[in-house]
């Protein structure tokens, strides 16, 4: 398996875990509204994972994706995971706005 494919798959796994962390952070914030240090960290984790997936997907050769199932699937899962991480980060932004919180670095 090509290095670029392995990197894309690894980035997708990281992004999926970041998205799960964001869900857990939102659940925690429902119980403990002052726990924004966790929410803030989950937001930035999702954004970093999203960028990593997008970058890894961009390194894959689109022409090779037409003929190689490994490359095609790696691009698909990296793109999907990037979108999920983005969606979960956006959910945290919505919650922050609802609770009048500014997400911090």
Regions from the PLM with identified roles:
Residues 1-105:
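Long, low-complexity or tandemly repetitive, helically biased scaffold regions used
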């Amino acid at each position: 398996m090509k290095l670029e494919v392995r990197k894309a798959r690894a980035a997708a796994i990281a992004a999926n875990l970041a998205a799960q962390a964001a869900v857990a952070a939102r659940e925690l914030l429902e119980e403990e509204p002052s726990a924004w240090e966790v929410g803030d960290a989950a937001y930035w984790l999702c954004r970093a994972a999203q960028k990593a997936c997008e970058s890894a997907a961009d390194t894959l050769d689109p022409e090779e994706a037409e003929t190689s199932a490994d490359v095609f699937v790696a691009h698909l899962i990296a793109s999907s995971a990037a979108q999920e991480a983005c969606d979960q980060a956006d959910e945290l932004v919505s919650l922050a706005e609802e609770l009048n919180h500014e997400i911090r670095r």
